[in-house]
Amino acid sequence: MRTSTQEAVLSAYIASIGKRTPREAAQDAAELCRLATSLNRLNEIACNSGLTERQERRKQNLQTRIKVVLERAGLVLNHFESDPRGYAVYLDLPDGSCNSFGGRECGYGIGR
């Protein structure tokens, strides 16, 4: 799924929760997609050659930053995925929507 589509879907869900204004929701969605894409890139590097200590710290920092943005936006993290063939971050959306073969249990993926 294209990032702009992911951003639009996330922005709509964040705004529907009511904790953020539409503008803040759009900013949160863009930041989440950007962070998740960076995390996915590190997953690709880890798969191909392994991560350096610096890259490991960056991965941890990205995961922490994603959790902060999710909490601020009112969304719930399902899990982080380290397999670079799929999405890097899976969320539990309020209506149970999903966009992967894992179904509702897996959640809605971003960051590919």
At which residue positions do the language-model features occur?
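Intrinsically disordered, low-complexity linker/tail regions enriched in Pro/Ser/Thr
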Residues: 2-3
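Short, charge/polar-rich alpha-helical segments
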Residues: 9-36
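Acidic, low-complexity, intrinsically disordered interaction modules
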Residues: 33-50, 54-110
